[in-house]
Amino acid sequence: MEEPALVEGQSQLPSPHHNSLRKAMAAALVLDGESTMGRRKKKKKESRPESIIIYRSESETLDEEPGESEGGDQPKEEEGDDFIDYPMDDGVWNVPVDSRYVTLTGTITRGKKKGQMVDIHVTLTEKELQELTKPKASSRETTPGGRKACQLGADRGPHVVLWTLVCLPVVFLLSFVVSFYYGTITWYNIFLVYNEERTFWHKISCCPCLILCYPVLIMAMASSLGLYAAVVQLSWSWEAWWQAARDMEKGFCGWLCSKLGLEDCSPYSIVELLESDNISGNLSNKDATQEIETSAV
């Protein structure tokens, strides 16, 4: 009579295989939870890009004037809405409260696809929009004839000159690094052109010269641009100093590629915005309930 009870007691004890299976399932659930949390955190960390350039096709460029005469900038607004609504459905991109989404139209003047019309989708704050739509006459009126340029104040004076002197070695170092980086990319693009797209004689004559001259050329270019940027940033006012200090490379690589006839080798493209008063009009007729607006400059 005791043996069945003993057998029942033994049957209630969990087997080692059952325990290992439970541990494996628990570990799988933990890993699944961690991966899910990781994906959620990764989605939260993803932010909206500051600017996106969309290249226009030839048909869009040719049909621009009829489209404007019929419906104004309505196609651009629809394009901007489609561009925004897709990521917003995922809840990943959030527009800041004081920011607005605009579409700037311009032409590439230097770099790849020179002369092509582009639409730049960018998120700008109200302050940036005010600076963008500020008329040029107002900036000229502040310094008529250069008389007010030597005024003393919080934003201009000897203390600013002292600050620029202190920043001189820092600007030189940063400009040297940035120029070295863009110069290396430009050199590599030029090397690929002569090595892959030109004739065999270019490959055996120009490519070895480019390799041998790279250290000398890159050091001379980076040092010269660093010294030039350090000297140019010496200023009397904060605004002029900031305008000069934030442009580290001075557009030298793009200018060099345009002079050599190798615009596609430029490490960047320079877009000249088309002048328009559409942004100013949208600012004056701003709707508080409108989250997304597109304009053309």
UniProtKB/Swiss-Prot annotation:
Q: Which segments sit on the Extracellular face?
A: 1-159, 232-297
Q: List the stretches on the Cytoplasmic face of the membrane.
A: 181-210
Q: Where is this region: Disordered?
A: 1-84
- The reply on keyword Transmembrane is yes
User: Where located?
Assistant: Membrane
Instruction: Give residue spans, biased composition: Polar residues.
Output: 9-18
Q: Name one GO cellular component term.
A: membrane
According to the record, the segments passing through the membrane are: 160-180, 211-231
Question: What are the disulfide bonds?
Answer: none
The alphabetical list of record keywords is: Membrane, Transmembrane, Transmembrane helix
Acidic residues composition bias: residue spans: 60-84
Where's it mainly located? membrane
Membrane-topology annotation of the record: Multi-pass membrane protein
Q: Which residues form the signal peptide?
A: none
Question: Protein name, please?
Answer: Transmembrane protein 169
Identify the coding gene: TMEM169
